């Protein structure tokens, strides 16, 4: 028979144990913090000072908008004006002496010269008047844009209504805006904040014109690309680019209601070039060439075709600047077009077709 051990329940000696109560086993309740007030105010960090904001977003928001140069006093203009008066007096004395000599020879010669002088003066006055009205139309568009910027900061609908009325007058000759004008007329009795009303006018009236402006820019860029690729001489490229850019800027101004004359066109071209020079966009140079011709495209493009693509993109950039200047409202409700929007149209897939299929 086996002897009992110490752990055998029949032979274990009695012992004392300490039992914990339920109150001790449960964790003590957390004391609630008494309400307190803080003196420090919440500070908001501006986007330009936020180090965690994407730099691309900051650059896109800070993209400069084309604005016309303000006319300033110039001694050159003063000198040209004085010379113009002097030559006008000289022409008047010459015409008077000529007509007197013709009358001394024969009356019908004198009357013919007088009628010719009157017709010439009338034509010159008509040309001057047309140029003045063209410049006034351009100034009216720029004044409307500046007033729209101010009205967009005011919540009151009254300034915005005045902007919409002026915008309707500027674009009344465009049939594409008829539907938008009717839609805005239906909102005359609605309660709309000033900024929202201006954005609504931009969507209804300017979006159809923006589509046409994009088509104008794209078609001009494609023509410049093709002519540059096939032209035998660089002087032909330069002449055609100047012609195409001038036609594009004029078409852009007429699209948005500017309709400038010759002097107004020269002023508009000067403003476009000044905007490109300020933003640094006129020097597309090596950076844009590497962007377009990189990623294996350089081996597939000839040198002339590459130059055509570069000139086409440069034409598109000039068209975007002209669009900025001629548009009667700033870009708020819709996205401002960029050079990247035309990149895919001017640089198709060279691997064979648009879908990448081998020809």
From Swiss-Prot:
Membrane topology reported for the UniProt record: Multi-pass membrane protein
Full protein name: UPF0283 membrane protein Atu1356
Organism of provenance: Agrobacterium fabrum (strain C58 / ATCC 33970) (Agrobacterium tumefaciens (strain C58))
Keyword match Transmembrane helix: yes
Keywords: Cell inner membrane, Cell membrane, Membrane, Transmembrane, Transmembrane helix
InterPro entries found in the cross-reference section: DUF697, UPF0283
Taxonomic superkingdom: Bacteria
Pfam families xrefs: DUF697
Main location: membrane
Keyword Membrane: yes
Family: Belongs to the UPF0283 family.
PANTHER family the UniProt entry points to: UPF0283 MEMBRANE PROTEIN YCJF
Region named Disordered: 1-39
GO cellular component terms listed in the entry, alphabetical order: plasma membrane
Positions of transmembrane segments: 75-95, 108-128
Protein's cellular compartments: Cell inner membrane
């Amino acid at each position: 028979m086996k002897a009992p051990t110490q752990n055998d329940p029949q032979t274990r000696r009695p012992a004392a144990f300490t039992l914990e109560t339920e109150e001790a086993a449960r964790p003590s309740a957390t004391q609630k913090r008494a309400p307190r007030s803080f003196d420090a105010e919440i500070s908001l960090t501006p986007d330009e000072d936020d180090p965690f904001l994407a730099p691309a977003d900051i650059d896109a928001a800070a993209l400069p908008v084309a604005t016309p140069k303000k006319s300033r006093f110039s001694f050159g203009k003063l000198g040209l004006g004085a010379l113009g008066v002097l030559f006008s007096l000289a022409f008047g004395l010459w015409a008077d002496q000529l007509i007197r000599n013709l009358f001394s020879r024969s009356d019908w010669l004198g009357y013919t010269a007088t009628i010719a002088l009157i017709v010439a003066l009338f034509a010159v006055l008509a040309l001057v008047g047309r140029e003045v009205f063209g410049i006034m139309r351009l100034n009216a568009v720029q004044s409307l844009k500046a007033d729209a910027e101010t009205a967009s900061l005011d919540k009151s609908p009254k300034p915005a209504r005045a902007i919409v009325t002026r915008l309707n007058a500027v674009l009344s000759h465009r049939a594409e805006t008829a539907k938008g004008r009717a839609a805005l007329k239906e909102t005359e009795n609605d309660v709309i904040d000033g900024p929202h009303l201006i954005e609504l006018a931009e969507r209804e009236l300017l979006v159809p014109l923006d589509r046409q402006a994009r088509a104008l820019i794209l078609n001009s860029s494609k023509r410049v690309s093709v002519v540059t690729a096939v032209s035998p001489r660089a002087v032909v490229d330069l002449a055609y680019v100047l012609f195409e850019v001038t036609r594009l800027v004029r078409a852009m101004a007429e699209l948005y209601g500017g309709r400038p004359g010759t002097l107004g066109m020269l002023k508009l071209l000067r403003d476009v070039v000044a905007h490109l020079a300020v933003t640094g966009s006129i020097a597309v140079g090596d950076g844009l060439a590497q962007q377009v011709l990189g990623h294996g495209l350089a081996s597939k493009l000839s040198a002339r075709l590459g130059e055509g693509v570069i000139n086409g993109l440069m034409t598109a950039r000039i068209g975007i600047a002209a669009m900025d200047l001629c548009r009667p409202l700033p870009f708020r409700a819709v996205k401002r077009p960029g050079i990247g929007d035309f990149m895919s149209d001017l640089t198709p897939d060279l691997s064979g077709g648009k879908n990448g299929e081998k020809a």
